[in-house]
Amino acid sequence: MVTINISNPVYFSDIKDVESEFLTSIPNGLTHEEAQNRLSEYGENRLEADSGVSAWKVLLRQVLNAMCVVLILAAALSFGTTDWIEGGVISAIIVLNITVGFIQEYKAEKTMDSLRTLASPMAHVTRSSKTDAIDSHLLVPGDVVVLKTGDVVPADLRLVETVNFETDEALLTGESLPVIKDAHATFQMNEDVPIGDRINLAYSSSIVTKGRAKGICYATGMQTQIGAIAAGLRQKGKLFQRPEKDEPNYRRKLNKYYLKVTSYYVQRVLGLNVGTPLQRKLTVLAYILFCIAIILAIIVMAAHSFHVTNEVSIYAISLGISIIPESLIAVLSITMAMGQKNMSKRRVIVRKLEALEALGGVTDICSDKTGTITQGKMITRRVWIPSYGYLSVDTSDANNPTIGTVSGLEAAMQDVLKEKKQEMKNIDPSNQPSDQFIPLLKTCALCNLSTVNQTETGEWVVKGEPTEIALHVFSKRFNYGKEDLLKTNTFVREYPFDSEIKRMAVIYEDQQGQYTVYAKGAVERILERCSTSNGSTLEEPDRELIIAQMETLAAEGLRVLALATKVIDKADNWETLPRDVAESSLEFVSLVGIYDPPRTESKGAVELCHRAGIRVHMLTGDHPETAKAIAREVGIIPPFISDRDPNMSWMVMTGSQFDALSDEEVDSLKALCLVIARCAPQTKVKMIEALHRRKAFVAMTGDGVNDSPSLKQANVGIAMGQNGSDVAKDASDIVLTDDNFSSIVNAIEEGRRMFDNIMRFVLHLLVSNVGEVILLVVGLAFRDEVHLSVFPMSPVEILWCNMITSSFPSMGLGMELAQPDVMERLPHDNKVGIFQKSLIVDMMVYGFFLGVVSLMTWVVIMYGFGTGNLSYDCNAHYHAGCNDVFKARSAVFAVVTFCILIMAVEVKNFDNSLFNLHGIPWGEWNFRYFLHTLVENKFLAWAIALAAVSVFPTIYIPVINRDVFKHTYIGWEWGVVAVAVMFYFFYVEIWKSIRRSLTNPQKKGKFRRTLSNTITTESKLSEKDLEHRLFLQSRRA
């Protein structure tokens, strides 16, 4: 990247000099053409820490895979015994396996990189007089960048405008406290200014903790301060710290250092410390099987008194190969890559592959309300003004102030709206509003950072937080928009919204030189700062009436804010005016009820969670009544539970109530609350910890800077892609591109589908290995004329079954659609993973009988209908005496192939019969449905069909059959094959029937009642009984 040449360090230069040196314009920014030219000149805004996906590393992992190592040894032994054909076939399969594995894993790595870019930090940049969000990698020197609370600074900036702006620079300086920035600060040219004291700069990767700012980008990529640190770390280039020679016990520490380094890189080369937990488990499995293969080879040699001839070596090769599922890792990589793509299609970006595996095991979802369960497009629905009464807005377009109607009702302070709604009368907002409305409208517009503008085409375009947009649109209805008011009011000072105190305030000066504070925030937090209302002292009864009105509005599902104002004396220095002074002795103006309607799909998604045994908790900063109304509407709280019901006391809590409970008190509850209102960031962390102590597997949503601790604490952290801060996205495991609660449920469903499919193809692959091992181990007993064992299956036959017959159907199983009951079952246990007891039992049962029917096929043909003459040298060559052996081998090969293909269809469902895979009532069953279930997965159907057809060329094509596969053509033996395959099919169906009879439907969740059906308000049930019925039913047995 080209170094940027400027006359002086930018922190010494004033704003105008920086603007001219970088040939930019603060109001307009660079033009798009100039930005493109500078991108070509200076390069992308990236650190050079990661070279991206390394092809040779991916290739090395394929070669050093345990599965591949066994094949390489087998090829070497084959060439060593001068069996060139067999060695050549094994070598070809090695090349094929490495090629397929390399292509799929490389594509998967590239896909992961591209998906990460989708969730990469964005920068808000002014170019050609328009501010847009662009990929931060496209920033160039001279760009004008706009920052707000929660942003990660995308490059090094010379600040040109700051409003209560602070950044966290702990990453650079180690300073734990945020640094207050000042765009207009200047320094003397010869002054030594440390990095942390350059308060007119904002550094790349620092976090905006407060306020907003604008700055000119002066350094990108490796030219930034963080880039300099990265360069220094690269020069050190050490994963482990080598001890210094003058350290005590230097020699012992040096030996430990070498041991750690060697161990790390050996494990890395072998794949034991890379990849996801499942990939690491399967890699460990591969090496275990490799060890078993060596043991089996030793058993073969021991059976021949360690007199190792060529035939003994070939038999050892066969047995070693039979235990290895050569295509397992490749099929897993393909399945994971497909899972990522499917997730992205369902608006979920997977940032960490571990989350892809874990989603299916989620037991609890802790979700925010605004924009996730609800639409995130708010409208001002109700307003209560003590000096007037009520205003009500009805509209179909949240962003258009010219659409909809405004109605009003003059009422006494103690009147309740719901008793007098019929008396409301329409108000024409285009007329000059009443004096009673002016403080309300000014506060809505001026204490506001949003913009509401109409384009030349008549379209209304809004920017900002939904709550502020709703207030701004409301004031705009009365022609009191912020742009209109700024003509007669001058901005002085802002006290930004703080999640701890839950309020915001601004100070403006009008044309008469009068300074006014406008404040908005949570009702309790504004009310505690108010001393008057409507010109009179605010007494305790007045406060109680305001709270009562707030609860009335909140009971309608409205988010209620309070507005306040006061005239303030001119300060000597506005920047040093304490917030407590500005926000004291306020005059209460009004309550504003804002409505954020639930998304249409939220209710169905919550119901689906209940059926899937997933508990949904809503953690929101809203008022308890607002949270309760929305929770009831979407089904988190059953609609028939009234507000007076005693069970509501544990269903809905405030953050302060929950925080007041000790861990012991929380753990003594049989169920955690469904809704936490007024929830602070630390409350979310406490909730997750409480769930973890109950052995729950938690998904947590978040969008703000303060949500990052809870996102990291959760098993699966979910950030919002549209409204989430960069810090939250960085702390998350997955990102929702549409901020929609139903997308979380979609992700869990996809996670369950993928988990089921991995279990399917793992079972399918390992069953054939178990069967082949049993066949070949027992086959050691079949001795020829020179007392050497004759294998019932040749090495090439085994490789064909494992690579061709099994691999492609296994890939098809990885593409299986979700079962109809995938969201009717309890979450799986992530600690156990795919190697559950049921899978191991099925593998042994199916594998054992595959070995039995294969062995019986061999025995029947050789000893039942044949002569039983095993002749000699039949493991290596064909001659007339080996005809029976080669025919029996063909039949065994056909039986193993067709049984493997039957298993590929049978494992589509672990319990249901092949004739009714989806388990529909038999009265609705028909043959068309049966055929549909067989061919609905087209890739699997074609893979099975082609694998079945491939048996015949291998048996009947001359040279290939006898010289390569070590078998020959058969005739009447097909009858034995058919009977053996039928026996295996019936055996599988009988075992499935036994499984169904042993399986408790309640454990499957098939008949589990939903939350709404489970709750009852019978007075006989105590609170704990009700909690128990609600939640403990859905826990694992």
UniProtKB/Swiss-Prot annotation:
Keyword Hydrolase on entry: no
List of catalytic residues: D368
Principal location: membrane
PROSITE patterns xrefs: ATPASE_E1_E2
EC number: 7.2.2.3
Post-translational modification: The active site is phosphorylated in presence of sodium or potassium and in conditions of higher pH. Not phosphorylated in presence of calcium ions.
Sequence ranges on the Cytoplasmic membrane side: 1-61, 105-281, 335-760, 809-844, 911-939, 991-1037
Keywords on record: ATP-binding, Cell membrane, Glycoprotein, Ion transport, Magnesium, Membrane, Metal-binding, Nucleotide-binding, Phosphoprotein, Potassium, Potassium transport, Sodium, Sodium transport, Translocase, Transmembrane, Transmembrane helix, Transport
GO biological process annotation, one example: sodium ion transport
Membrane topology: Multi-pass membrane protein
Induction: Induced in conditions of high pH and in the presence of sodium and potassium ions. Induced by manganese ions. May be induced by calcium ions.
Pfam families assigned: Cation_ATPase (PF13246), Cation_ATPase_C (PF00689), Cation_ATPase_N (PF00690), E1-E2_ATPase (PF00122), Hydrolase (PF00702)
Keyword presence, Iron-sulfur: no
Glycosylation (residues): N869
Entry GO terms, CC: fungal-type vacuole; medial membrane band; plasma membrane; plasma membrane of cell tip
Residues reported to bind ATP: T370, E468, K520, R559, T620, G621, D622, R678, K684, N706
MF terms in GO: ATP binding; ATP hydrolysis activity; metal ion binding; P-type calcium transporter activity; P-type potassium transmembrane transporter activity; P-type potassium:proton transporter activity; P-type sodium transporter activity
Location of this chain's protein in the cell: Cell membrane
Transmembrane segment boundaries: 62-82, 84-104, 282-302, 314-334, 761-781, 788-808, 845-865, 890-910, 940-960, 970-990
Residues annotated as binding Mg(2+): D368, T370, D703
Catalytic activity: Na(+)(in) + ATP + H2O = Na(+)(out) + ADP + phosphate + H(+); K(+)(in) + ATP + H2O = K(+)(out) + ADP + phosphate + H(+)
UniProt cross-references to SUPFAM superfamilies, sorted A to Z: Calcium ATPase, transduction domain A, Calcium ATPase, transmembrane domain M, HAD-like, Metal cation-transporting ATPase, ATP-binding domain N
Extracellular-facing ranges: 83, 303-313, 782-787, 866-889, 961-969
Cofactors required: Mg(2+)
Entries under NCBIfam families matching the protein: ATPase-IID_K-Na (TIGR01523), ATPase_P-type (TIGR01494)
Annotated protein name in UniProt: Sodium/potassium exporting P-type ATPase cta3
Species this chain originates from: Schizosaccharomyces pombe (strain 972 / ATCC 24843) (Fission yeast)
Gene from which this protein is expressed: cta3
